[in-house]
Amino acid sequence: MPENGRLRRTSARLTQNGTSTSSSTIYQNGKRTSQHAQETSTASNKKRKVSTQSKEDKLSDIIVDFNLAVNELYQLKEYKSIISWDPIENSSANDRGIKAEFEEFVKNNDYRLVWDKEIENNSNIDSLPLRFQKKKLAEQNKLLDDKFSIRQNVLASSKMLEESLVNKTRDEVKIESTFKAIQSQEKAGSKLKTPSQTSNAKTNIRKSGSTTPKRGNENGSRKQALEDQDEIIELSDDSSVVEIESDLSDAETHYRIKCIKKTVPPPLVTHPSHIPQWRPENLEDGNRSTGRLIQLKDSSSSSKIINFDPTPLEIIQLKDEVIAAPKLTEKLQNFLNNDFKTPIIDESNVPDYNFTRDEYNTIMSQQEKLLRKLYHKVNIENSLELNGDKIERRKVILPQSNIKLTDPFRNTFSVKPKLHGAANNATHQDYLLAQGMAFSKVHQQMRKQHHLRTRKIAAMIDQHFKKKKGEKERLAKEREQNLKKMSRLTMQAVKKRWNQAQKVYQIIQNEKEEELKKIKGRQHLSEMLEHSTQLLEAQLTSSREPTVEAESDDNSTTFDDNTNDSDNFSSSEEEENEEDNTQQQINGNKKYDVNGKSNDENDMSLSVEELRKKYADLETSVEPLSSNVTSDKERESETSSEDAESSDDDDTDVTRGLASLYQNDEVADFATTTFEYSAEEKKLIEDLNQESDSRMNSLLDSDSVSSISDSESSEESSSDTEMDQSNVSEPPRSSETGSNTGLASLFTNGTIVSDEEDDASISSNFENESDESMNSSDRELEVNGNGKIDKIASTDEDDSNVEIVNGSKVKDVPIPSLLRGTLRPYQKQGLNWLASLYNNNTNGILADEMGLGKTIQTISLLAYLACEHHKWGPHLIIVPTSVMLNWEMEFKKFAPGFKVLTYYGSPQQRAQKRKGWNKPDAFHVCITSYQLVVQDQQSFKRRRWTYMILDEAHNIKNFRSTRWRALLNFNTENRLLLTGTPLQNNLMELWSLLYFLMPSSKVNQAMPEGFANLDDFQQWFGKPVDRILEQTSAGNSDLIDENERTTQKMDEETRNTVARLHQVLRPYLLRRLKKDVEKQMPGKYEHIVYCRLSKRQRFLYDDFMSRAKTKETLASGNFLSIINCLMQLRKVCNHPDLFEVRPIVTSFAMPRSIPSYYQSTNELVKRQFNKDEKVSFQALNLDVTGCENMNYFVCQSTGKLMTTEPFQDQINKLKILLVEFENSDPINYVSYYQRLRREEQAEIKEKLEHVVYLNNLRCGRKPIYGESLLRLLTVNAHDFSDEPYNKYCLTLSGRVDKMNDTIEKYSIITPAAVALDMKDQLIPISTKQRILHEVAENKIDNPFHKAQVKLSIAFPDKTLLQYDCGKLQKLATLLQELTSQGHRALIFTQMTKVLDILEQFLNIHGYRYMRLDGATKIEDRQLLTEKFNRDPKIPVFILSTRSGGLGINLTGADTVIFYDSDWNPAMDKQCQDRCHRIGQVRDVHIYRFVSEYTIESNIIKKANQKRQLDNVVIQEGEFTTDYFGKFSVRDLVSDSNIGKEITDRTIDFSGDAKMGNVLAQAEDEEDRVAAGAALKEVAIDDDDFKEETRSATTGATPAPTETNALSTTDGDAAFIDVDYEDGIGHIDEYMLRFISDGYYL
């Protein structure tokens, strides 16, 4: 390390540094003290002992020196100085431990001593857990101890030595400060001059001071040593001033204190320059001024420790509390006047202090040298220039001018004078003058430039000194601004900390308040539900009392026979026990247990008369529930009975009905004794009582007759309904006043049946009945506008006319005659339940599962109102746009007697339909859509509607939307909601639907308090649903067992919460599932088919997941980008062509092949190398047979016509010329050229001779036989058949046809590149010319076209469509198996492009199919579905998931195949219900294709969780599905390689509109257009249910929060520190306590 020299001397310097400051005190009067001499001798003795040290002692010294050196180095590196260095702070002798920063410094720089490198190799120790790190270090220490036996002794001795060394240094510092204080006191005492009379007082004071008890420890710190010094006191006695030394506490009272002097000792170390060889680490980065000043010091002085012994600072405090230091003031004044100078420094970061005279002179000389260099560079060398406040290199800027500047001397060598005229007769003088004028202009321009440059330099210098003139003020202002800024930041930080503390305190308080609120809410809920259970049973019994009285008054034998009939007692034992328990509770005679089981004897053994006597006194206990029309005597008797009953049951306030449960002050207490009526009021009450009794008797008489026909009609269907209905019984009816309804109209006579009792009383097929439906109220009321009660219930009907619908007893109503069709048993029960809702003036929700016939039940209800109550309407039915036509067709089919108005069309058409609709019986039923009813809400609000029915009512789940508020204010008598999935997302939606059922005034009268307060409702029932899943599902199963009872797996608390919610919802909701109510319906079996990815799919999937962009996108957390990635992965799983279309392979076409460029050259070279000397036999007439085609006469004529004489004459002449010049040599140019000419002539002569020779040979040819003889002797050949030749030698067209199959089969590999001239090289020229000729005449086509195209363009094989996708491979096998067994399948997919691929797949395999997607029109959809259901020859129907869920009945199919799963499992469930519904006669098998080890397998797990929640909702769940409507990115992407980099972002797919928007943005452009067309119809419904939250209002008013006022006390009690004894503790705790005590406002 670079600090080795310093590290070795650190411990010695530490001791020297600690003792050097006391060197001045050791010498007194030039003599050395004995103490110092003794120390010197001790040090010399130590040096002598070094040589005799053992090995352990040497190692200990090395360790101590090294530790102290590292400690000092850390101090210098961290604080740039050792002014306040405490060696024990980071020493091993420190008991408080070593700082983590020091350990990090040692670790990073590897400043440690190593015993053995191999053993102490800790390179990988940081990657281990903490417990393994400790274990490894312990093992290392053990190995080192085993190897070095002296290690522990060396470490212990080094620690002791280091501790003694550090403590010794600190003790020397304390001794030194104490010695100085004593020395200063002695000097002051020697200078004391006092009269004799004051010396005695001084002596007395010193003596008293000597008896003063000691303060602090004997080994006290430096502060205590300073406090122990005697203080100098000046006493004034008249004119004499005496200075004495004593403690202030010992001063006598007869002295007056004039002033007090205190001495402040100097610091131990004052400057880092006092340490040898110390320099700053980075002079360039920081502390430049300090580094410069240190460099200015003499190098010789830096190698020694400078003795720094300043005199102590004396401070005087006068009587007027003025503190002064006169010596310090004089020193400062002397320094500023003589030694301090401020040089001019052109650096803003250098402060203007700490300059002595030498430093000033040094810096000034440097500045002078710098200015001289700048002057030389700027003015002499002209290499620099002053640009503002910067000195930069000079830039040469050429003047911009349009005039071309030329040098007259260099370019033209002269300046021509300008003269008028064409002639230039200028003389030498003219040229000289012109030259001088031009030169003068040049000098003038240069002079101007010099002037301008001088002005600029002067301006810059002036600006520079102006800036320097205000440098001090500017620096002072900057320092002031910095201080203000620091103060402001500090203030803001403190304020921010207090604000944070206040927020934390507020959060803590809110948590406490929320916890208290939850506790109160649970108590209130428990009390409410307990009282509700008691009073519901009480009202069940009280409803029978008026009937009992009527039976006792009426002695007709018919009624007695009916009541004595054994069928009246066919109800189950469970219901009788409940009735007995209710009566016992009201009478206060007996108690009942939690399950409602009675301890009394069974009422089955009692006769009717005995029962009348037994319950004769029941009226007094339940009178307040019946009517307020009673006499004063009856009220007194009721009051007395109530007083008697209150002593037995204090918890139940029967006089208030259900109002006592909800603490509703608006419900009046009519049963108290405080009511007093006048005479007129009593008379009016009696008249009303008589009138109601007469009307009740007439109604009883009329209903008794109708009950006979009802019973006869019920006997015909008894065989069908025997297995569907449980044991039935009819409790008697009674009426109530409209003012005291509360929840009475909702919960009247409602029985609370436990799960165990349901299993025992209801048939086996109704085991899970409580999972699907809710009870309804039994009491039937109709309140008129004047508050009178019309009793419409008939109590003389047989018990066979009363049935139990899911635990509630409702009246069996007759099937209306207007209804065309037959109702199934459970549909008849639904009609009874709906009729009871109307009779009780209660609204409800029919939440049957999709496919159970909610439409026909609604139509039967309207028909019942028309037939039985003569209520023809008008009724308003609001449905989605896509099913308006379906509703109209259902009305025409099942209830053609109604006038139906389908309200749709343009604004003009709708206005035309509204004309005259206020007339009576203009229409009975109005069917419209959500969108239109909101647009024309003013017209609909002006009309009074009998029933408002909302189909798909779960779409009004948002109570903040404009549509919800608009429909809430419609003028309707009753409301009915139809939904197949009442709870899709959260409990707020359920609250929204329930609140919608009870608008305006019904909220305070007919609803519990919890319904009106969303916060309480959420707090009671809206707990997270993950607890249910933890207990009910393993979460990894592929299939959900819907028949498994989920409640059995819940814990007690969860089961209780579900039971509470059931009790609150039971009057409003009726829900049945197909598997429970429709026993003739076949079973439904679901199969998960895992499909392996094909090789191409796996390659694309892994390639996409391994892309850096994909990892970056998933890790970024951007919502749309993540969805886009997930969509791409789903496309790969569905089919790789959706992600990347298999390309059409084409070859690269080259105009010429590579060999063609050098083929001709190659042939020529080959010909030259293979050239052989050959003899032409034909030219020499040696080819005997070559002349047989010639005639004799032709040969003779040829010989005669031969003319060789001209050639021979020319040859002879050339011979003569050549002979003359044969031996002549060239002697000159002429002879040379003549010789060249003779050589040419000789060559010509040789050619002519060769021509003559060849001509003679050719003309002398003669045949042996001749052509005539050969023709004469030739005989014609026999004509053989050409069939073998034609068989093997085909024509061109025949060869093309024969090779087509070979080309088709074996042309499978497309080359990467093809050459267009290959056919020219392979096909002979003759053949090519013949083909071209025939092609030009259109005789044949190009025979090579197919081979060329087949090789150059390769289209994907159609069979690859199946083999590229694992799902299609599975689908091919599955369809082959299904069609062979006669099954028909529905194939659902989410993506529109998958439908196109499925069409190609079905066409390849030859299956007949039909297609339906979002682009199919509404009128065509019905035709397609009917055609498919009628024609069994069509085995496959492919549909879009969204279009398949919109009012389609496809019972002709018995198999459902989900090619891909929808994000929302509710959509898949709707698709299943299109096949598994009423009319299906075969078992339905559902196959769900899932690509294994992909995103789809993760999606199906989440979908299964939500589907299991569907088994829990409404009956067994905690009614919040937000957990399942959201997906986690990390859960979906199961790739472990990038799982750590992905942000665990939650993706919400709970809303269909949100889902559609996200998918539309994530898909490709082509697929987006196709999906938009496919989802066109869904978009219309989405427009109907589009939420508008801009003008949203809060659904519930939060409860006010109580705030406790801060309690303050008077006097000092408000400021008592209550934490004084325990201590402040952490600052955060102190701030919280400070705020909680109310001091922080």
UniProtKB/Swiss-Prot annotation:
Keywords: Activator, ATP-binding, Chromatin regulator, Coiled coil, DNA-binding, Helicase, Hydrolase, Nucleotide-binding, Nucleus, Transcription, Transcription regulation. Residues 555-571, 701-711, 1591-1605 have a biased composition (Low complexity). It is an enzyme of class 3 (hydrolase). Gene3D superfamilies: P-loop containing nucleotide triphosphate hydrolases (3.40.50.300), SWI2/SNF2 ATPases, N-terminal domain (1.20.120.850), Tandem AAA-ATPase domain (3.40.50.10810). It catalyses: ATP + H2O = ADP + phosphate + H(+). Residues 461-521 form a coiled coil. Residues 572-581, 639-652, 712-723 have a biased composition (Acidic residues). Its main location: nucleus. Belongs to the SNF2/RAD54 helicase family. SWR1 subfamily. Component of the SWR1 chromatin-remodeling complex. This is Helicase SWR1. It comes from Candida albicans (strain SC5314 / ATCC MYA-2876). The gene is SWR1.
